[in-house]
UniProtKB/Swiss-Prot annotation:
Protein's GO biological process: 'de novo' UMP biosynthetic process; pyrimidine nucleobase biosynthetic process; UMP biosynthetic process
EC class name: transferase
UniProt KW DNA repair keyword: no
Functional summary from the UniProt entry: Catalyzes the transfer of a ribosyl phosphate group from 5-phosphoribose 1-diphosphate to orotate, leading to the formation of orotidine monophosphate (OMP).
Record's catalysed reaction(s): orotidine 5'-phosphate + diphosphate = orotate + 5-phospho-alpha-D-ribose 1-diphosphate
Lineage of the species this protein comes from: Bacteria, Pseudomonadati, Bacteroidota, Bacteroidia, Bacteroidales
NCBIfam families assigned to the protein according to its UniProt record, in alphabetical order: pyrE (TIGR00336)
A GO molecular-function annotation: magnesium ion binding
Quaternary assembly: Homodimer.
Cofactor(s) demanded: Mg(2+)
Organism: Bacteroides thetaiotaomicron (strain ATCC 29148 / DSM 2079 / JCM 5827 / CCUG 10774 / NCTC 10582 / VPI-5482 / E50)
Protein name: Orotate phosphoribosyltransferase
Family indicated by similarity: Belongs to the purine/pyrimidine phosphoribosyltransferase family. PyrE subfamily.
Binding, 5-phospho-alpha-D-ribose 1-diphosphate: R97, K101, H103, E123, D124, L125, I126, S127, T128, G129, G130, S131
Amino acid sequence: MKNLERLFAEKLLKIKAIKLQPANPFTWASGWKSPFYCDNRKTLSYPSLRNFVKIEITRLILERFGQVDAIAGVATGAIPQGALVADALNLPFVYVRSTPKDHGLENLIEGELRPGMKVVVVEDLISTGGSSLKAVEAIRRDGCEVIGMVAAYTYGFPVAEEAFKNAKVPLVTLTNYEAVLDVALRTGYIEEEDIATLNDWRKDPAHWDAGK
């Protein structure tokens, strides 16, 4: 496990951006029941942590993707960090809506991209990957090349891994499910007996039953 993954997991747990409640699960917007909730947007309220995320995403982009022409943030969670990263790299920035706005030019992509541009997408969190990959499709329809995506966190669901593989989008993240559980267990945030419940949920989150 990489040092960055552990370090960022520690920071997220410290500010309570991640909540683990196997006995009292959350309900996601999708309707899924989940013992795990991650709100990366809380990092924006902590200047040193906000800067850490910007620096590390910027570093990953430079290391993994080389020549980049523009940064795209996925609305709404990744707009702030995407803009900060674009500023650090001195690159154009756009953001991609989940649906076109219902007035004006009805844009899906806000900002300006030119055909042929190499774009890296910034995302705050990967669950199923559906909304993230819709943003990729929108950028590709504009004639640009999406050379990769960097996200703050991924649950690592099999459905998401398969979706990114099929879409041919390399994905890099600051931290992930395994790192969070490792840190949470070592620091007493969760108990050993919670691990089986959390792992059962991650295998099939759509059908997970908290009572089993």
